[in-house]
Regions:
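Helix-coil boundary/capping segments in enzymes
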Residues: 1-223
């Protein structure tokens, strides 16, 4: 079996809730050429980022299964709490539907915001027990309720990892938002080519320093 272990899936423009475009949180243009946020846009480089086209692309390239991770643009950092909860819940429901409709083709991830631990635990329980999602996607760093950037592996977030360990989840740690707390000009893809590696290294440093690989042996973690 050939498995794509790091895949992303974009919603079609009409699948994105209107409030997300109205508030410039995230949207796709009608021609499916760009994904956009306030003061940011990135080209959609291939039609296979969308569901039906991805299925065709997988068949053409003899890929049997794909692990679909959450969109990095929708980790919720910097959003108000109610907006963040709506965005994350929508994304998790979207991924759950993809997995439910195509269980032989996709294993999909879900996301929570580590800055609000209690609501994060509720969402983990919902995604695992109601939606049958088993891959928890987390950023290397998150913005806490005081406006401070913290590594995801922090004493404040330990209840999240305790629950992930209880459920035996796969946990995928993905770098993003580096330009929001690393004070350098965003040019020459430096945040993708250099600083994302540094973010992973920083996160991994605290993962091992705090002994989480030993404390949570049922939690399978990748960076």
């Amino acid at each position: 079996m050939r498995i794509n272990g790091h895949s992303h899936l974009l919603p079609y423009p009409e699948e994105i809730p209107a409030f997300m475009k109205e508030k410039e949180i995230f949207w796709i243009d009608e021609d499916r050429k760009f994904m956009l946020q306030k003061n940011w846009k990135r080209p959609v480089t291939d039609s296979s980022f969308f569901l039906h086209e991805k299925l065709e692309w997988m068949a053409k390239n003899h890929i049997d299964h794909a692990v679909v991770l959450n969109l990095s643009q929708l980790y919720g950092n910097g959003l108000r709490m109610e907006e963040m909860k709506q965005v994350l819940r929508w994304q998790n429901d979207f991924n759950a539907k993809v997995q439910a409709d195509h269980p032989d083709k996709f294993t999909c991830g879900f996301v929570i915001h580590a800055g609000f631990v209690r609501s994060a635990l509720w969402e983990i329980e919902r995604c695992v027990e109601e939606l049958d999602l088993r891959v928890l996607c987390l950023p290397t760093h998150y913005l806490d309720s005081t406006g401070t950037w913290r590594t995801i592996f922090d004493p404040e977030t330990e209840p999240i990892f305790e629950l992930a360990n209880h459920y035996g989840l796969a946990v995928e740690i993905h770098p993003y938002d580096g330009e929001k707390f690393i004070q350098l000009e965003n040019t020459a893809w430096r945040f993708h080519l250099v600083w994302m590696l540094a973010q992973c290294a920083d996160s991994y440093h605290f993962f091992t320093l705090n002994g989480y690989h030993e404390r949570y042996p049922n939690m399978r973690t990748c960076f």
